[in-house]
């Protein structure tokens, strides 16, 4: 077996590397070339990069494409650029805006991975005769411990917990996992940068890319307003107990759990606890109203060994992350008449619809990724849940 788990010599194995122009994917290309693989580098031009050309931490923009080209020249592999701007807008940017005006907190990186990178680019890699598509993500894959067929693989958390990207990859399908390779899964980021220096790559000291590459300076509301001019409609700021406290200029300016910049002063600390898109109301309340014990999921991608329905009916004990920066915490995957849900044993504050809930076998660096889903509804403590239900059933002011 070679280092990518193929039963052939590296020189007989063609690999396409998804190159963003950053240090991680550049090192992947360099490592594979050094090991003797037949390597092709492909960079996707994903969005109108005019505003991002000179912005540190951008991704798949003008300078990034040039950096990827220079890296490929340095290590001696072919480099191709594919224009996916229209596809990226259709499958990532537009749904991102739609989700925000619906009162959700979307994660466009998941959509990008599943549509543009792991679907379209993967198909292109196969057309080029590649045996695998390699990326610079910090996650591990290896042969499945209980394979149902030859070549089945499973996902695991990486060695560098601070760089763990498994949360953004929960929706990777089994077919995609079998074809993908993640050479950096066993390396710390510091070693990746050291390798870039050793290889003489121009990106060795380049800043890491931002989570949301197409949002300049992190101002989500700017891009949503541009794409959806009617999104910034005014409405009420309402307390969980029914009091109208003020007005806002669009729910897209708020997120669940927000405390600063709400726009009301009451003498008590208030947090955004719910965004009522239908009635254009921002619902605020005390911190304890953010406490969440249960989240209902949609679009579940299941990577466990037993059937999803059987696992949920029996109450599948696992660990869950509802934020990329948190460690997995004890959870139970179950189901009821409403659908699949995850019971968060220790609770979590400020969980918003649209966020992901990724599932794991444990909390360590070698924990297996069981998949996950998008949160469609969160359930609070009984008192807060009852108050919110009563408020939503009451008509909003005209």
Curated annotation (Swiss-Prot):
Segment forming the signal sequence: none
Site (Interaction with tRNA): 137, 355
Pfam families: tRNA_Me_trans, tRNA_Me_trans_C, tRNA_Me_trans_M
Localization of this protein: Cytoplasm
GO biological process: tRNA wobble position uridine thiolation
Superkingdom assignment: Bacteria
GO molecular function: ATP binding; tRNA binding; tRNA-uridine 2-sulfurtransferase activity
Residue ranges that the Swiss-Prot or TrEMBL entry lists as coiled coil: none
Designated name of the protein: tRNA-specific 2-thiouridylase MnmA
Species of the source: Sinorhizobium medicae (strain WSM419)
Protein encoded by which gene: mnmA
């Amino acid at each position: 077996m070679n280092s990518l788990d193929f039963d052939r010599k590296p020189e007989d194995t063609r690999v396409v590397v998804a190159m963003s122009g950053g240090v991680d994917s550049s090192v992947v290309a360099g490592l594979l070339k050094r090991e003797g693989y037949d390597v092709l580098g492909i960079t996707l031009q994903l969005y109108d990069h005019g505003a991002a050309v000179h912005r540190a931490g951008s991704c798949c923009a003008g300078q990034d494409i040039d950096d990827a080209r220079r890296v490929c020249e340095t290590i001696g592999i072919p480099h191709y650029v594919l224009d996916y701007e229209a596809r990226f807008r259709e499958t990532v940017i537009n749904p991102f805006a739609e989700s925000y005006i619906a009162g959700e907190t979307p994660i466009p990186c998941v959509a990008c991975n599943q549509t543009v990178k792991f679907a379209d680019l993967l198909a292109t890699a196969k057309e080029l005769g590649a045996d695998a598509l390699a990326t610079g993500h910090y996650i591990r894959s290896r042969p499945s411990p209980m394979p149902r067929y030859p070549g089945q693989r499973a996902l695991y958390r990486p060695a560098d917990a601070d760089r763990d990207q498994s949360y953004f990859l929960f929706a990777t399908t089994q077919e995609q996992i079998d074809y993908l390779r993640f050479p950096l899964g066993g390396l710390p980021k510091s070693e990746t940068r050291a390798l870039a220096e050793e290889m003489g790559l121009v990106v060795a000291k380049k800043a890491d890319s931002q989570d949301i590459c197409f949002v300049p300076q992190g101002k989500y509301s700017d891009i949503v307003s541009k794409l959806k001019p009617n999104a910034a409609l005014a409405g009420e700021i309402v307390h969980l107990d029914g009091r109208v406290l003020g007005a806002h200029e669009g729910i897209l300016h708020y997120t669940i759990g927000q405390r600063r910049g709400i726009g009301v002063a009451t003498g008590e600390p208030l947090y955004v606890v719910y965004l009522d898109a239908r009635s254009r109301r921002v619902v605020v309340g005390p911190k304890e109203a953010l406490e969440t014990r249960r989240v209902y999921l949609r679009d579940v991608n299941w990577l466990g060994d037993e059937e999803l329905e059987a696992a949920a009916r029996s109450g599948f004990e696992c660990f869950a992350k509802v934020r990329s920066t948190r460690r997995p915490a004890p959870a139970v995957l179950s189901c009821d008449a409403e659908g699949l849900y995850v019971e968060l044993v220790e609770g979590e504050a400020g969980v918003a619809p649209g966020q992901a809930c990724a599932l794991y076998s444990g909390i360590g660096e070698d924990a297996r990724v069981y998949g996950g889903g998008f949160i469609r509804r969160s359930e609070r403590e009984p008192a807060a849940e009852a108050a919110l239900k009563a408020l939503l059933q009451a008509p909003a002011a005209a």
